[in-house]
Regions:
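Flexible, gly/pro- and Lys/Arg-enriched active-site loops
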Residues: 4-38, 43-159, 164-167, 185-191
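Acidic, low-complexity intrinsically disordered tails
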Residues: 178-186
Length: 191
């Protein structure tokens, strides 16, 4: 799985169920990466899209607890495990906040547009720069669109440190339990 988002300098992704900024290059990148693919989103994200419909030229899967919810051009699922099975490993997580938090541990790569401005958000993406489980893989040059400076950044899961793989000194290796064979096998054979 992959995640894709645009974040402000505080890792904000939205306010009042709308994007914080509209940057043409970000929208083109989103389209190029997700078109023809499966996208997974929450109900509020779907409702924030034009006409509240699934994105064109994509398979849209919407995770919601509302059993009565229906939407055009979208498959509705009600459980995270159902979403994973329906979406498959090549799905793109596109929001919102709770969906990112829930599925980020399953992602192999995260594609972010980092915008160097404060969008006064009320919804946030996890701060990957402060998370030891993620590391920057690639960064574009800093670009500008209508006075907004931004950068494309890709994150990948961090490789575990060697120390993470070793037992600490307080935890000596444990010997496997030793089992003595029973002296009388008749209890096992039914005789």
């Amino acid at each position: 799985m992959y995640a894709i988002a645009a974040v402000d300098q505080n890792w904000g992704i939205g306010r009042d169920n709308a994007l914080l900024f509209h940057i043409s290059a970000d929208m083109k990148r989103f389209r190029a990466l997700t078109e023809g693919k499966t996208v997974l989103m929450g109900r509020k994200t779907l409702q924030s899209l034009p006409n509240g419909r699934g994105l064109p030229h994509r398979r849209n899967i919407v995770l919601t607890g509302d059993r009565d919810f229906a939407a055009e051009n979208a498959e509705i699922v009600h459980f995270p495990v159902e979403a994973v099975f329906q979406a498959g490993e090549d799905a793109w997580i596109i929001g919102g906040e709770s969906v990112y938090r829930r599925f980020l541990p399953l992602c192999d790569r995260v594609y972010l547009t980092k915008i160097f401005a404060d969008g006064h958000a009320d919804a946030f993406f996890p701060d990957l720069d402060s998370d030891p489980h993620w590391q920057v893989d690639t960064e574009s040059e800093i670009m500008e669109d209508n006075g907004l400076r931004y950068q494309f950044v890709e994150y990948v899961p961090a490789a575990p440190e060697e120390d993470d793989l070793l037992l600490s000194e307080e935890e000596p290796p444990q010997e496997p339990p030793q089992f003595a064979p029973p002296a009388d096998f008749s209890v096992f054979s039914g005789f």
